[in-house]
Amino acid sequence: MNMQDQVREWQRGGYTISTDDARLDIPTIHDFIANQSYWGRGRAVEVVQRALEHSLNFGLYHGKQQVGFARVVTDYATFAWVADVFVLAEHRGRGLSKWLMEVILAHPQLQGFRRWVLATKDAHSLYERFGFIPLHRPERWMERPDPNMQENPDYWRTVRRNR
């Protein structure tokens, strides 16, 4: 259930960040996740759409063109997970990912949580600026991964065929 009470927008130097789901360019988001990201290669558009429906989404736009994205999966009470963060290559190097994280962490509905988490292979220095650290007590965390997903670039195509 999407708990958004209202659409919010932020402007900076010709760019806009918006929580308006109606503005999301699903083909752009899907293309990046399924074809350019290391974490979601091959992910079906239906899976991306379902994830968007159950997240607080932050679209990054230059004019009307979507150039970046992030989403937060949360219970709006104690826990938030930042996922699927990206800025298209031609818009990188302008501080947009930093601005996106500033906006997310300042969002009024995302305050007072006990814990924020995320996973990254290559952007540790970005997230450290915002107080993210390696898991404090990793021995307390567990995961239940799909054994077929681990490092399998065809995972999402396989899931799609078997459903």
Short names for language-model regions:
Residues 2-43, 153-163:
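Short amphipathic alpha-helix that is part of the acyltransferase structural core
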Residues 63-64, 90-91, 145-148:
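Short loop segments at secondary-structure junctions
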Residues 110-146:
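Conserved active-site alpha-helix within GNAT-family acetyltransferase domains
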Residues 21, 43, 64, 121-122:
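Short beta->alpha linker loops
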Residues 43-86:
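A conserved beta-strand-loop-helix scaffold within acyl/acetyltransferase catalytic domains
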